[in-house]
């Protein structure tokens, strides 16, 4: 994921920042507890496509 793109993208629901979870290939919104998938290098920023995250699950930013 390009860092410049990550700086621009926000959660479509709350407009909050997102964190890239490289291990699961997702963008995480900690406010709404949603994980948006990245498919073929393209973030899918649709609430219907997001999954609920588990509270306290660590995100691998590396």
Curated annotation (Swiss-Prot):
InterPro entries the UniProt entry points to: Trm112-like
Q: Which domain of life is it from?
A: Bacteria
Q: Note one Pfam family from the annotation.
A: Trm112p
What Gene3D superfamilies does this protein map onto? 2.20.25.10
**Gene Ontology CC, one term:** cytosol
What family does the Swiss-Prot or TrEMBL record give for this protein?
Answer: Belongs to the UPF0434 family.
Q: What name does UniProt use for this protein?
A: UPF0434 protein Rpic_2808
Organism of origin is Ralstonia pickettii (strain 12J)
